[in-house]
Every structure is written in C-alpha cells, then in structure tokens.
Amino acid sequence: MSGDYEDDLCRRALILVSDLCARVRDADTNDRCQEFNELRIRGYPRGPDADISVSLLSVIVTFCGIVLLGVSLFVSWKLCWVPWRDKGGSAVGGGPLRKDLAPGVGLAGLVGGGGHHLGASLGGHPLLGGPHHHGHTAHHPPFAELLEPGGLGGSEPPEPSYLDMDSYPEAAVASVVAAGVKPSQTSPELPSEGGTGSGLLLLPPSGGGLPSAQSHQQVTSLAPTTRYPALPRPLTQQTLTTQADPSTEERPPALPLPLPGGEEKAKLIGQIKPELYQGTGPGGRRGGGSGEAGAPCGRISFALRYLYGSDHLVVRILQALDLPAKDSNGFSDPYVKIYLLPDRKKKFQTKVHRKTLNPIFNETFQFSVPLAELAQRKLHFSVYDFDRFSRHDLIGQVVLDNLLELAEQPPDRPLWRDILEGGSEKADLGELNFSLCYLPTAGRLTVTIIKASNLKAMDLTGFSDPYVKASLISEGRRLKKRKTSIKKNTLNPTYNEALVFDVAPESVENVGLSIAVVDYDCIGHNEVIGVCRVGPEAADPHGREHWAEMLANPRKPVEHWHQLVEEKTLSSFTKGGKGLSEKENSE
C-alpha cells in the first residue's frame, strides 16, 4: 500500500507542477495547492499506537502510586500506632497491679505476674479441698468385668499425676512458699521426706486474706537455691509407700498450715525414688539383673479357660502393675511372651506398650493341648522391656502350674501373680526351617528357605520385616550370597524360596553356609535378628550334623529346624576361624 501511496503523491505533484508552470495566474492554483497539502498530511497520519502507549503508561504510574501510598500507610501504622497502643495498654493494665501490690503484694504478680490469678481454673481440685471434678475420662478396656474390684487381688489405686505449677491456686502457692520450696515454672523443687518437708502442703490458709509484703520478704529469704537436674517422673504405688531415712539429708523445716476445724492434713504429690538415681549401664539403660533372684517386679493379671470340645487352653492377658523402670526416662516399654513348658513349640507375644509401668493388654491367645497332657504342662509368662537398638531386657517371669484347676475358676475373676525377677535367660530370637540338597554331577547346592517362627520383634509395632540371606563361606571369607523376598509385619514368615550356589565336588568339604535372618528398614540400616551356620567346621553341632546328612544323601533335600543365635554368640564360623561380622550379614 505504501508504493501506491507514493505513486499517487508523485503523480499529483507532477500535475500540480505542470499546472503551475502552464497557468501561473489560474484561479484553480489555490485549490490544487490545498488538495496537495491534504494529501501530504494524509500520508503522515498520527498512529494509534502512541495513544495506547500513553494510556498504558498512565495506568502503571497510577497503580504504583497507590501501592506506595498503601505501603507508607502500613509502615506508619506499625511504627506509630501499635507502639503507642501497647504503651497505653500496659500503662492502663499496670496501674491496678501496682495498686494491689502496695497493701499485700499479691501472689499473682509475685510468682507469675501478668495480671491474672494463678490456679483459677483448678480452684475445685480435690487436693485443694474444693469440690471434686475429674481431670480425665476413665478408661474402660474390653473385658472390663475382669478388671472390677471384685476380682482376686482387689482393685489397684490409680496412678497419681503431676499438676503444672502455674495451675495451683494462690493459697496453694502460699503454702508451698511457706514450706520452704521456691515456686518455679520450669523445674519445681522435689519435696523432702516425712515431717521435714516430705511433700508439698496444698492447704488453704486459715485466714481468707493474702499474705502481707513483710511475710513475702521472709519467705523469699527461706527459699532454697539448689535444684535437682530433672523433673520428677510420675509416681507409682510402690513410690508412695516408700519411706526414706530423714537423717540422710538436711531439709529446710516445713511450716504446716492447719485446716479449718483444727485438723492438719498433708497431701504428698512428689517423692524421690532412690532406684532411679542408681548407676546406668551402657546406652543409658539401667541394669535389670543386679537384684536378688526371685525378687518381685510388679504383678500381672490374666484369666484361663479350657475348651473341652476343641482341646484348647485360652489365655487372656489383662494387665500388669508396678513394673520396674528399665529406661533412663523412668518408664519401660513392656510386652509379654507366653508359651507352654516343657516343649516351647508355640509362643505368643503381646503388643508393645510405650512409656508405661502399668500396661493394659487385654489380648487373648489359644494353645492346642489335649486334656490328658494339661496336668503335666506349665504356662510360662515372660515380661520384657522393648529396646529398639539393643537386646530386650527381661523384667521378670511367672511360671504357672495346675492349669486345669485354675481354668475351672469363674471367668469373671482374674488371677493375679507376682512377677519374679528372672536370671540370665538365653536370648530367644526364633527358629528357621530350611533344607539342603547337593547335586554332585552338576556341582549345585540348593538351599530352600521354608519358614521361620517366633522371630524377635524389631519394630515398635511388635513385628518385623524379615528376609533371609544365605552366604557361601570358605575359610572365613564370603564367596557368594543370595537373598529371599521381604515379608512385611510378621514374626512367622513363610518363604518356600530356593537359593542356588555353584559348588564343585572337590570343594564341598571346604565350604559352609552362614544363614542370617535380617529385619528390613526402609530408613536406616537393616538389623540382623539372628544367624545359624551349617558346614563341616560349624561351631554348632546341629549345623555339622545337617551338613553331613546332606552329603550322605545326595540329590535329596534334607530339612532341619535351626535355633537362631546372636551374631556375637557365634564369634566365628569355623572352630577357631574367622566369621562374618554383623555388618557383613546385614548387607
């Protein structure tokens, strides 16, 4: 289009020039000149893009101005209005507080400050003499009729709990200060024993008024400055009944406050448990076998019933009380294993209960045992403390005989037995069933992993994720290794998987197998549950017998059960030789 426009312009210019040259004085000259000027102006029009650019620029400038104005207003409000408001609010709220401190120095401002009364929400706590109210809902587990006070052994008192120092009423705090204990929100003082400060006196004052400023000055001078390094743990029944010698440690004298009516009453809410301050073993765990053998370690409740139609002994584990603390935090992670003596073929295990000394299990198990054999059988309970990174600690055990007589008791009356401290019990890691088959002509050794039973629980859920790894060993060195699949959340996995190794006939007398059951962890390192070893130079006689039977019966699978042991128990694969380390077994 630009070419046509220029041609038209040139053509009209030529016509105009010719007209001007031909008729200089013609009247149409002015009209021609006007037409040429209009055509020239039309050739250079003002584009619409310029108008759009100006409009867009004006919109952007306006928006930026509005944003800057908003930011400046917000900054001014934060710098000027908020500090002024806070200053004014504190001045208004601080006036009455100082006014209250003048005549009586209120404890709300002395202890915690802030303009609110301490313990207003717990004014009716039973420890403070007010109306009783429940702090939590009672737990009603399944088979609750077996836990009623009518059962054998009676009901057990509930475990007391601690209250936060900030939740005590002013009268309680006054009694604490009067008893020589300095209140604190972070680490409250532990009370002393007996009449020399054995507990905190949570009693209301005989007079209804607040203490004076002079009394507060005297109380401040009586407050001790020493503190214990940690908060006390929750109390148990055993702790509440423990009495210490008051002459062993000096305590500031207690100032008991009388109740209205002339009677004095003290509530014990904290007490030192001496066994918690004994020396700890490796890893911060306290030794559980230093005490006298057979000493009681709490109590366990259960119920028995025999089903004559199906020849089953039903065992229901209900709860345990007053277990000893095996962890450095003052608690344990208990679980119970049960099995029938003397064969121990079938074992059961409860779930692990975290951080408790009074676990409630309510789990039922069944043993298949004929009625004729029940009189010769004994039921064995083993209470363990779960430990994720080391060997589980044996808390205690109970051996029960006369099963038929006990099973005939009414089912609504549970049985209570004392848990006796056990000695050094052999680690029960489980058993592994596999077969060996050797083909001399093909030089092939086939290891068929069939199943495992009663494996050690390695996870907090009370289960493991086991797989089996077999390693071909020669002179303490690993030549080859094979693995099975992983079985999730089980202690009795079934595999039925074959692991094949190439072994020349001339070398079969110089090699052996190290078979490890490993717990798989998606995060972290896999952990070895237990190992067993077979071969001509195996330390276990059962492993040597299995290998010899395989060589004596070529082309036939020879199946055996093997007891799993800890890696450190079998320090070497051969007699006097060098074995695989735990790291090599877990790889």
Swiss-Prot record:
Residues 10-34 are annotated as: Cysteine motif. Residues 76-587 are cytoplasmic. One of its GO terms (biological process) is cell differentiation. The chain crosses the membrane at residues 55-75. It is found in: Cell membrane; Cytoplasmic vesicle, Secretory vesicle membrane. InterPro entries: C2_dom, C2_domain_sf, Synaptotagmin. It is a single-pass membrane protein. Keywords: Calcium, Cell membrane, Cytoplasmic vesicle, Differentiation, Disulfide bond, Exocytosis, Membrane, Metal-binding, Methylation, Repeat, Transmembrane, Transmembrane helix. Ca(2+) 1 binds at residues 327, 333, 385-387. Residues 183-258 are annotated as: Disordered. Ca(2+) 2 binds at residues 327, 385, 387, 393. Ca(2+) 4 binds at residues 459, 465, 519, 521. It comes from the Eukaryota. The cysteine motif mediates homo- or heterodimer formation via formation of disulfide bonds. This is Synaptotagmin-3. The gene is Syt3.
